[in-house]
Amino acid sequence: MVSSWRVQQAAQDIRAGAVIAYPTEAVWGLGCDPWDEEAVYRLLAIKSRPVEKGLILIADNIRQFDFLFEDFPELWLDRMASTWPGPNTWLVPHQNLLPEWITGIHETVALRVTDHPTVRELCALVGPLISTSANPAGRPAARSRLRVEQYFRGQIDGVLGGSLGGRRNPSVIRDIATAQIVRAG
């Protein structure tokens, strides 16, 4: 487990506009403060990812997403709560409460409550984070710190060390309205 002071330093860096890499359940991720437009666009440029695709928000608990859930049916809240924390990402209507640099061209936003202990601690300190796999567009996602450093040396602001969570595949992505799988895990 990563020492708490390293997580606190990463949180401080994120608050200051940093783009960092960190281990997640299955692959290494890149993240930043979702409300920092400059940081998000820098992350997108580092990955060569078009803004139109949208990004995932991760959190340490469902309450960090409450601002999006005001008019949600109880069934939707139950669906999310029954699968979190864990490797389930839900596409939910963003109701124009999020900027386009997070949602892209979509009417929905991807949300996940992580069960990775280091990332949960980080989100507990800074709130929800942008999280995307640590790889340039078209390349395999990084499964080691070495690969992260090979891909992004000199482009990101830091690497929060630690181990992957042991999952083989990225999270399942489901549509909240239908519970249909959009991407298998």
Swiss-Prot record:
Molecular function per GO:
ATP binding; double-stranded RNA binding; L-threonylcarbamoyladenylate synthase; tRNA binding
Per the record's keyword annotation, is Membrane included, yes or no? no
Question: Main role?
Answer: Required for the formation of a threonylcarbamoyl group on adenosine at position 37 (t(6)A37) in tRNAs that read codons beginning with adenine. Catalyzes the conversion of L-threonine, HCO(3)(-)/CO(2) and ATP to give threonylcarbamoyl-AMP (TC-AMP) as the acyladenylate intermediate, with the release of diphosphate.
SUPFAM superfamilies, per database record: YrdC/RibB
UniProt protein name: Threonylcarbamoyl-AMP synthase
Q: In the Enzyme Commission scheme, what number(s) does this protein have?
A: 2.7.7.87
Record-level GO cellular component terms: cytoplasm
Q: Where in the cell is it found?
A: Cytoplasm
What does the organism's lineage look like at the top? Bacteria, Pseudomonadati, Pseudomonadota, Gammaproteobacteria, Pseudomonadales
The organism named in the record is Pseudomonas syringae pv. syringae (strain B728a)
